[in-house]
Amino acid sequence: MSDYKHTLNLPETEFPMRGDLAKREPNMLKRWYDQDLYGAIRRAKAGKPSFILHDGPPYANGSIHIGHSVNKILKDIIIKSKGLSGFDSPYVPGWDCHGLPIELKVEGMVGKPGEKVSAAEFRAECRKYAKTQIEAQKTDFIRLGVLGDWEHPYLTMDFGTEANIIRSMAKIVENGHLHKGSKPVHWCTDCGSALAEAEVEYYDKNSPSIDVRFKAVDEAGVAAKFDCAEGHTGKGPISAVIWTTTPWTLPANRGIAMHADLDYALVQVEGEHPERLILAAELVKDVMDRAGIEQFHNLGYAKGAALELLRFNHPFYSFDVPVVLGDHVTLDAGTGAVHTAPGHGQEDFVVGQKYGLEVANPVGSNGVYLPDTELFAGQHVFKANASVVEVLTERGALLHHKVFNHSYPHCWRHKTPIIFRATPQWFISMEQKGLRQRALEEIERIEQDGIKQHGQSGWVPAWGKNRIQAMVENRPDWCISRQRTWGVPISLFVHKETQELHPESVRLMHEVAKRVEQSGIQAWWDLDKAELLGSDADLYDKVPDTLDVWFDSGSTHSSVVDARPEFNGNPADMYLEGSDQHRGWFMSSLMIGVAMKDKAPYNQVLTHGFTVDGQGRKMSKSIGNVVSPQDVMNKLGADILRLWVASTDYTGEMTVSDEILKRSADAYRRIRNTARFLLANLNGFNPATDMVAPADMVVVDRWAVGRAKAVQAEIMAAFDEYNFHGVTQKLMQFCSIEMGSFYLDVIKDRQYTAKADSLARRSCQTALYHIAEAMVRWMAPIMSFTADEIWALLPGERGEFVFTEEWYDGLFGLEAGETLNDDFWAEILTVRGEVNKALEVARGEKRIGGSLQAELTLFAKPALAARLNALADELRFVLLTSKAKVVSVDAAPADAVATERDDLWLSVAQSAAAKCDRCWHHVEDVGTIAGHEEICGRCVTNVEGDGETRQFA
């Protein structure tokens, strides 16, 4: 018996079946960096149209988490796909380096500035700490396969960037957007200073709970707003009732907040002293119960919106206050009307800004009422609560009073209760130079430009526009000053007596920026005023405040994008961050861009959702559901993480768990197996000498290349629309269905058994080559490591890296006018699906083993029969049976198997012919050829003759 194995073209490749990514990816990374891959991409793309994705800087503190990974991977997918689309797309990663979290870490290590270390030493320690954090995060970002200028990232603490931040501030001052005002901050009366959110802890505390009457100025006008029955508007004075747990803030009251959409009742209280009270309709019974009022009824109702700007008398001062509307008003407790003191609460401040209410602050830094505070001067606020209650009682304004225990903010150092207190701050005004209106116009422009240029809104997903629009419409002036040590100085000089800015502030800020560019922000604190102000030095103070860190990152379009040479002066095309950044970086960048240049700093804004576990819960160490990107990379590899990111619809919450990642790993294996089949069957193929011209190729091979061409068009469009889960779906479908379930199955016989250099086999290899060239590029933005691995093993001359290439342009397909066109093969696929079902039944009934044991009869109506007969004897290769005969439907026996098609019945029989040892087909001529008794005539031709001819399959 002869052994024909050596006559077969068995697949062979160095591309392993197992990715073993966790072990092998680091070596690939090393090669990328040893060979300066990022530089190679820049050189290859030089002179192409630019696409700039500006990196929103993560904060330089702590390890990267799964959300960071999602963000960086999405950016990397876009950058790489833009490169393939013919753009020069440099990527400069950045870090946000100033601010409180780093200060707190450094305080824990060296103590507070001004205690054990000087402020200058403290800043130096902060800089050093930020550097260590950046290095750790950088290592993890690089490990994700993210390509960028990691050797030269931008840091907001680089001297040049710090200087440019000051220059950005100078431009805003020059354009007239800056003003000085007051803003409430957490204030510790023991520290005598403002506290940041992170310095506040919550403990239980006893506080007074009071309901207070504010009497209406115009009772008839107020009553008229309610839908009372005619002539039944009640009797007695009308009061709006507010509830508060901080009576000491009532001296600063400047308004009563109600909710526009809530129903309010005008309540008649009966008895010896009748009165009418305004309360939220749902809370009337609660208020009456706690006030001990039994006889009452509702006279009428009005929406909060109808009561806007009605005026009520302050309970103990001789002025009146308006009703204002705010979304912070709820029915959770109280009366539905909220005491509003803009100097003592953040929500009060925001609503107060909207209505132009005075930001009154009668309280000094030590928690004592200022000397000019009527009734309460010199009292400590917490001790004054009792005095306020006493005054309210005397004036007949107190409806109810009790003491209750609740959670209250305390200073983390002193463990003592804190207050909200308005302090002088610097603001970017939303109104004084029309900033709000221009920002809203830019939001609209971004949407419209996107539709014109890309067929979709510049806000991706489109709901992002409404979100940021609502925020801009309602946002107060931006408080940009902070009383911190580690931050970019606001760099202003103010007159000691008038508190006015120096008339040459803009020039002076540019002078400060020059010094900061040389030696960093410490230059400001080391600066002797006389150096810049000369003889005026004694008249002016240096403002000690630092800039809000959101100003640092929000001005990077100017301090980084405008400054880096690789961006060639082009503005950013895209900003891409998590959905929390509508309030954060997207907002601060928009405000600064419009304030500086009258233009948004981006053309497109892409938003991704947050990561949650498989049950939709937030990641939490206490729940134990945290998925660490480092763990995923160490176990499964970065390409699995990247495939998960791409496969997930990022427009909503992104679910991740071990089980979900396992599914990504399974999908990855299917794609890898397809790639391995392509490479293994390109063994011995040299495109320079073995390529077959399209006109000479076997028809099904041209069909397969045509399918790749169609899929490539869909994939390119999906990349352009940032629809990455669409890309992965199309790639999976192509690998699993069109290739795996059909084409790669059909060609195995020809690929393995045809003469090695025959047209039949070279045609097939030509198709596989074109498909592999296209597919490796589709994969490259997402499964970058695997694409690099495939690229290195593809035959033919090529550059070192797939990432310097563009989409493959060598694809072609069948012409629509051909008989065996795409529609023909689509029908063949449905017929094959029906045949497979019939073969499966026969296999289940033990009538056949493999499909090659089957002889198939297809009973077809004339039109289908004609199409099937177009494949002649090659129909059996398409259906993977040893024989396939097409017969008129009229000849179908009663036991023919019906199919889901109304023009096809099938009959499956076991072949009586012997099996060819080489191709495994059952053929009558096996055993009839002298010297080759074990194989069929077709195989003899392929082994000894010129090789078989294939036209169709």
Curated annotation (Swiss-Prot):
GO molecular function list: aminoacyl-tRNA deacylase activity; ATP binding; isoleucine-tRNA ligase activity; tRNA binding; zinc ion binding
Lineage: Bacteria, Pseudomonadati, Pseudomonadota, Gammaproteobacteria, Aeromonadales
Binding residues for ATP: 621
Source organism of the structure: Aeromonas hydrophila subsp. hydrophila (strain ATCC 7966 / DSM 30187 / BCRC 13018 / CCUG 14551 / JCM 1027 / KCTC 2358 / NCIMB 9240 / NCTC 8049)
Keyword Heme found: no
Protein name: Isoleucine--tRNA ligase
Motif ('HIGH' region): 58-68
GO BP annotations listed: isoleucyl-tRNA aminoacylation
Catalytic activity entry: tRNA(Ile) + L-isoleucine + ATP = L-isoleucyl-tRNA(Ile) + AMP + diphosphate
Domain of life: Bacteria
Chain ranges for the short sequence motif 'KMSKS' region as given in the UniProt record: 618-622
Subcellular location: Cytoplasm
